[in-house]
Amino acid sequence: TLFRSIDCLGIAKEFNEALYKAFIGAGINLPKHKQMIMTICDSEKDEALPVAKRFAALGYTIYATWGTAKFLNDNGVEAIRVNKVEQESPTLLDLILGHKIDLVIDIPANGIERSHDGFIIRRHAIETGVNVLTSIDTANALLTSLESAGEQHTTPIDIATI
């Protein structure tokens, strides 16, 4: 198996500003439509709930597969149910290809795909310029950056002086 990693550095005096700069440098460019897709395996749903609540508090519309949408709705987070790739329209893929989505959070069970849906969703999202996260930790870091983005005034830092 070949793994690829892209590292990005944000330099600032404050953590939130450095994090914000790192996400911008990595090409994470949010928000446009404030619409996102969440597909979360059962074992990660409890950990993903606070993430969904924070995105909802930022004004994001959350689309989710049936199981994830039911879990979120049952726990006080409004989520719109959308069909999986192989089901009838509207599907998650329809939303991605329709350029309506800014972010996909796709968390498979222990990194294992039970179907090809996750791969198809991630591939098409990346090909159409949609940001994709596959880790709750990264989603939390992005949220920290987004929540403080309104107060961000990025300050240039001369790295030669560090």
Cite the ranges covered by each PLM segment.
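Long, charged amphipathic helices and adjacent flexible linkers at domain junctions
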Residues: F15-S43
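Short, small-residue-biased leader/transition segments that mark boundaries at the very start
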Residues: T1-L2
